[in-house]
UniProtKB/Swiss-Prot annotation:
This is tRNA uridine 5-carboxymethylaminomethyl modification enzyme MnmG. Gene3D superfamilies: FAD/NAD(P)-binding domain, GidA associated domain, C-terminal subdomain, tRNA uridine 5-carboxymethylaminomethyl modification enzyme MnmG/GidA. Homodimer. Heterotetramer of two MnmE and two MnmG subunits. FAD binds at residues 13-18, 125, 180, 370. Its cofactor is FAD. NAD-binding protein involved in the addition of a carboxymethylaminomethyl (cmnm) group at the wobble position (U34) of certain tRNAs, forming tRNA-cmnm(5)s(2)U34. It comes from Pasteurella multocida (strain Pm70). Its main location: cytoplasm. NAD(+) binds at residues 273-287. Pfam families: GIDA, GIDA_C_1st, SAM_GIDA_C. The lineage of its organism: Bacteria, Pseudomonadati, Pseudomonadota, Gammaproteobacteria, Pasteurellales.
Length: 629
């Protein structure tokens, strides 16, 4: 039976990738259908109750700059906001919000249900309808068929998902939800490379059974950040603290004594887990010299007693999980509400995708999210947005669009996946981007909002606000260029009081702002440079653009030079252990692959352009920088 209406775009799955994938073509004016197995879990935070972080916060801002939902939902659900790396340079500063799961899911559903051109239907999809090498619809479990010109698959961990708790396992997409087995079997018949990955989650703890009085509190920032460029602190709900406890030798002894009951160490789980979010079993074994690991006790919401113990993801049996939890300070009488578990699932080799996230073998079929080998809500949402945009452009027979590496972290993510592939769950870090001084959280709108406007993704209110901000930035930069202070000025004494060294020659406002001891607030407190601008976002842009101008230009030159070193030889017995600045992951991969040239090294999965720069410097220092034949 065919559904009475035809659609331009169908999205399968209502998680973080699926919601962004559905909203984008709908905003572009295309008739879109979102199919989900359960409308009550749209926007569900299946693992940790948080949005943002290093690299991830950058993705959230980019999604927002293009009219996406994640930042707005986080602003409305965030119960603790922090700016990470606030004392470091602007390239690595990142926003993170602890989120109320219920409020987040509520914000997502409201946005979806109020979006024009978007329908939602609850049914599991079991098959994809193909006409030779082109997708033309889907089939649901009840036999209902839907026609569409493009289909986006965002199935998360549901494809042949298998949940492990100790040596017991059963099929499931996540705790409480069924796996998508029929669709997984159908996809395995297609010309796509499939493999298995795994991820895990910690047990959830009853807050009423924790002794918080003996634990350290962690509050959010006093000056609360916001994620969305259209957001406001007024949108934030009540802010609450997290708490910190630690594992100890007793905890580690419990884990070591029960490794034979771990599905990972017993060889039952075949999928590779996320390197940067390891299970507590992995942490204890990999870092055996450490006798303690910090654990963050994160509230799951304002109206929930559930606590998420960030740092003890595990698939050990329930009785062992209880011993682990009860071994920690403040947790001696803690009770588990939900057991931790590991989940294995199908993912597709992202090298079989175009940079638009359309499959190379089937026209009009797009993949986004964890099924492409990534981990994290933000990575999924970024892919969903990109797939949604390109599905919309495909339907309209318009030229595809995807961001370059120098345009967005979404561009870095997709380029890494489609060019290099991945054998382990991929997450974004600022260190993966060679252009990170250009790809800051604060300038995501200037990088991407004009493109979003061209694509029809943002409304006129956002466009007008963006243009006003850009105008404010340009006018203020012009003003600071035109105001000069000279050694004979009547304001010299006032200026010298705040300058690290006395002014000996004429300087503009921009020249003074470049000084390390100077910032915009101090500069505009000086009589010649008053008044200060009210637009704080524009102020931040002005200050960063002036202070980091030289660094940005230097980085662009570095990239051009790096391209010239494609054939630079690496000695066969080069010692990577002496190269300072390489991450353990990169060093291990270089040792394993032993590339013969810089070009070859740059194409190893996980070896970042930033790592290549470090390697080039080391080769030069050791007198080994020679071009290949």
């Amino acid at each position: 039976m065919f559904y009475t209406e035809n659609y331009d775009v169908i999205v399968i799955g209502g998680g973080h990738a699926g919601t962004e994938a559905a909203l984008a073509p709908a905003r572009m004016g295309l008739k879109t259908l979102l199919l989900t197995h359960n409308v009550d879990t749209l926007g569900q935070m299946s693992c940790n109750p948080a949005i943002g972080g290093i690299g991830k916060g950058h993705l959230v801002r980019e999604i927002d700059a293009m009219g996406g939902l994640m930042a707005t939902a986080a602003d409305q659900a965030g119960i603790q906001f922090r700016t990470l790396n606030s004392s470091k340079g602007p390239a690595v500063r990142a926003t993170r919000a602890q989120a109320d799961r219920v409020l987040y899911r509520q914000a997502v559903r409201i946005a979806l249900e109020n979006q024009e051109n978007l329908d939602i239907f609850q049914q599991e999809v079991t098959d994809i309808i193909l006409d030779q090498d082109r997708v033309c619809g889907v089939v649901t479990k009840m036999g209902l068929k839907f026609h569409a010109k493009a289909v986006i698959l965002t199935a998360g961990t549901f494809l042949s998902g298998k949940i492990h708790i100790g040596l017991e396992n059963y099929t499931g997409g996540r705790a409480g939800d069924p796996a998508s087995v029929m669709l997984a079997d159908r996809l395995r018949e297609l010309n796509l490379r499939v493999d298995r990955l795994k991820t895990g989650t910690p047990p959830r703890i009853d807050a009423r059974t924790i002794d918080f009085s003996v634990l350290a509190k962690q509050h959010g920032d006093e000056k609360l950040p916001v994620f969305s460029f259209m957001g406001s602190v007024d949108q934030h709900p009540r802010q609450i603290p997290c708490f910190i406890t630690h594992t100890n030798e007793q905890t580690h002894e419990v884990i070591r004594n029960n490794l034979d009951r771990s599905p990972m160490y017993a060889g039952i789980i075949e999928g590779i887990g996320p390197r940067y979010c390891p299970s507590i079993e992995d942490k204890v074994m990999r870092f055996s010299e450490r006798n303690s690991h910090q654990i963050y006790l994160e509230p799951e919401g304002l109206t929930s007693n559930e606590i998420y113990p960030n740092g003890i993801s595990t698939s050990l049996p329930f009785d062992v999980q209880m011993k682990i939890v009860n071994s920690m300070k403040g947790m001696e009488k803690a009770r588990i509400i939900k057991p931790g578990y590991a989940i294995e699932y199908d993912y597709f080799d992202p090298r079989d995708l175009k940079p638009t996230l359309e499959t190379k073998s089937i026209r009009g079929l797009f993949f986004a999210g964890q099924i492409n080998g990534t981990t994290g809500y933000e990575e999924a949402a970024g892919q969903g947005l990109l797939a949604g945009i390109n599905a919309g452009l495909f339907v309209q027979e318009k030229e595809a669009w995807f961001p370059r590496r120098d345009q967005a972290y979404i561009g870095v993510l997709v380029d890494d996946l489609c060019t290099l592939g991945t054998k382990e769950p991929y997450r974004v870090f600022t260190s993966r981007a060679e252009y990170r001084l250009l790809l800051r959280e604060d300038n995501a709108d200037s990088r991407l909002t004009p493109i979003a406007h061209q694509l029809g993704l943002i409304d006129e209110k956002r466009w007008a606000r963006f243009n006003q901000k850009m105008e404010n930035i340009e006018l203020e930069r012009q003003r600071l260029r035109q105001i000069w202070l000279h050694p004979r000025s009547e304001y010299l004494d006032e200026a010298n009081k705040v300058l690290g060294s006395p002014l000996v020659r004429e300087a503009s406002g921009e020249d003074l702002l470049r000084r390390p001891e100077m910032n915009y607030q101090i500069l505009t407190s000086l009589t010649p440079f008053q008044p200060a601008m009210d637009d704080q976002e524009a102020v931040e842009q002005v200050e960063i653009a002036i202070k980091y101008q030289g660094y940005i230009e230097h980085q662009q030159e570095e990239i051009a030079r790096q391209k010239r070193h494609e054939s630079t030889a690496i000695p066969a017995h080069f010692d990577y252990t002496v190269v300072s600045g390489l991450s353990n992951e990169v060093r291990a991969k270089l040792e394993q692959h032993r590339p013969v040239s810089i070009g070859q090294a740059s194409r190893i999965s996980g070896v970042t352009p930033a790592a290549i720069s470090i390697l080039l410097v080391s080769l030069k220092k050791q007198g080994m920088l020679k071009r290949g034949e």
